Amino acid sequence: MGHAHAPRRGSLGYSPRVRARSQKPKMRNWAELGDQPKIQGFVGFKAGMSHIVMVDDRPHSATEGMEISVPVTIVEAPQMHVAGIRVYDDSPYGKKVIGEAWISDLKMLESLTHLPKNGYKTDEQLAKIAELVKKGVVADLRVMTVTLTSEVSGIPKKVPELMENRIAGGDMAKRFEFAKSLMGKAVGIKDVFAPGELVDVSAITKGYGTQGPVVRWGIATQKRKHARTGKKRHVGNLGPWNPHRIRWQVPQLGQTGYHQRTEYNKRILKMGDKAEEITPAGGFLHYGLIRNDYIMLKGSIPGPVKRMVRIRPAVRPKNMPKQAPEITYLSTQSKMG
């Protein structure tokens, strides 16, 4: 006798499926780098997609050495301005801030927060951090970076984005000296990543509001006699009589989309500052023209056009070629149809 094979629909690994608190993705893990200090994160804005033709440089691939067509995502990456340093200590309840120092000129943040009238005592705070580093109590060091969204013409937001990015590589003393050298300076995407490198991309996905269980979980619609009740797009059974409650594993309607998602091992195929090389005729749909540095990633990334994306070095990189690929064609045809 046949046996019905009906595994559960949808993954419980993403539950609870609720709206993200902010459009600013959170980085919870970072890769460990070599001996030289380096900023580990960067911020960009999704401009759109295109396709290229490149020579397949993956070893032992069936198309190795041949030209292949590859979909790509273009991300505009304006410069980040380093506004401060923050150091952490490991406590039994997680990381705890034990010191921070800000630059004295923070006019770029006037529209974001209230600034102290007497300014910041930068030198005094840096001396305190240096003493903490010397004592060996600093477990993690990060820089406070500001992205001026007013420099990005493709998005309507003008309030700057303030976030933390980790400094990795070398001992803590080297990291602190490197962070001090960046205070008040601008950092470009080329200072952090290189073509051919693998990165992880985090963003908030496109939101669809409240959707039924068929769209939200992928359950099957009711068939034959069960559909005669007039209800097709609902789960057939909410659970047993006892216990008198519905288990959280039962697929039901609710929020769909607008969740934080991270995609691993996206390869950087191209970087540059000449936007005319990659901008399609008429500009990117719903975005316009790129006026800053850009980064081209292989494949798709989470989120709609104009969404902020955060990029970090891959935490579990695959064995891929580390050099820049050979691109023979880059489509700049109009995306307007």
UniProtKB/Swiss-Prot annotation:
Similarity comment: family membership: Belongs to the universal ribosomal protein uL3 family.
Keywords per UniProt: Ribonucleoprotein, Ribosomal protein, RNA-binding, rRNA-binding
PANTHER family: 60S RIBOSOMAL PROTEIN L3-RELATED, LARGE RIBOSOMAL SUBUNIT PROTEIN UL3
Location of the region described as Disordered in the Swiss-Prot/TrEMBL record: 1-26
Entry GO MF terms: rRNA binding; structural constituent of ribosome
Protein name, per record: Large ribosomal subunit protein uL3
Source species: Methanocella arvoryzae (strain DSM 22066 / NBRC 105507 / MRE50)
One of the protein's GO biological processes: translation
Cross-referenced Gene3D superfamilies: 3.30.1430.10, Ribosomal protein L3, domain 3, Translation factors
Lineage of the species this protein comes from: Archaea, Methanobacteriati, Methanobacteriota, Stenosarchaea group, Methanomicrobia
Pfam families, per the entry: Ribosomal_L3 (PF00297)
Physiological role: One of the primary rRNA binding proteins, it binds directly near the 3'-end of the 23S rRNA, where it nucleates assembly of the 50S subunit.
Subunit field text: Part of the 50S ribosomal subunit. Forms a cluster with proteins L14 and L24e.
A GO cellular component entry from the record: cytosolic large ribosomal subunit
